[in-house]
Design a protein with these regions (language model features):
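HotDog/MaoC-like acyl-thioester-processing domains
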Residues: 1-43, 109-113, 119-143
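Catalytic strand-loop segment that frames the active site of acyl-thioester-processing enzymes
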Residues: 11-79, 93
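Hydrophobic beta-strand-centered segment that forms part of the acyl-chain substrate-binding groove
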Residues: 74, 80-121
Length: 143
């Protein structure tokens, strides 16, 4: 903006091997108990399709339910990690003000039929799935 560097973004993306046939599913960690503030959304296929279009994300796990189930092995459409992170970032800004930095890590996929609860406790943020598992964690540093 006016020749000034305003935002720096870094991505560390880890792609894992497919699990061996018959291997047990990883155990999801429980989300922290208690929060200063929380709110929930109910993602649906239309939201995921629109977000895919907006972000030019062509991965079919976000908009093609038969593919997500039958080929990738998910229970339904997968909610985008960056969509969850954006909701956490908005929650942080609404409660704490302008951000200096924001970092997040996805830990368990959230399906389109699951309620996502966005929680904040100070600078710590997380997404809780309907079964109490932690789907994402984040930290916010305020300006």
């Amino acid at each position: 903006q006016d020749g000034q560097h305003c935002i720096a973004e870094e991505h560390d993306i880890v792609y894992r091997e497919d699990p061996a046939p018959g291997a047990p599913a990883p155990v999801a960690q429980p989300a922290p108990e208690g929060s200063d503030f929380s709110r929930s959304i109910h993602p649906d296929p239309v939201l995921l399709f629109r977000y895919s279009a907006l972000t030019f994300n062509g991965h079919r796990i976000h908009y093609d339910a038969p593919y997500a189930r039958d080929v990738e092995g998910y229970d339904g459409l997968v909610v985008h990690g960056p969509l969850l992170a954006q909701h956490l970032m908005l929650l942080a800004e609404e409660v704490g003000g302008a951000l200096r930095s924001f970092a997040f890590r996805a830990s368990s996929p959230l399906m389109h039929f699951e309620t996502a609860t966005f929680c904040r406790n100070g600078e710590d943020l997380w997404v809780r799935g309907p079964d109490g598992r932690q789907c994402m964690s984040a930290t916010a540093e305020f300006a």
